[in-house]
Amino acid sequence: MTKNLDKVGLSSIVDDYQLFYIDLWGVVHNGVSLHEKAINTLKEITKKDKEYVLLTNAPRPNSAVKIFLEKMGMEKEIRDHVYTSGEAALSYLNKNHFDDKFFHIGPPR
């Protein structure tokens, strides 16, 4: 049976899975402050020896987003699970095309 997690919460399915991919923006924080219920659920996932990845499409390295989250008060143990699209792009370029030319489309960084 499908559960409506908006009503029953993620903690209702923690025992059913080993790994969770969780969107960061809007789920764990709103850009200004952390969502305490989400933080408590992440701690519960950890206590139950489960794993999670906090995904974001931020076009920056993981380290930049971790600094942003630290300023909001997120504990290091939770921040260490962040993975950004910017980090994925950097990893891909370093692995496959480090010496090749490429054209960047987007705002200057």
Provide a role label for each language-model segment.
Residues 1-109:
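HAD-like aspartate-dependent phosphatase fold
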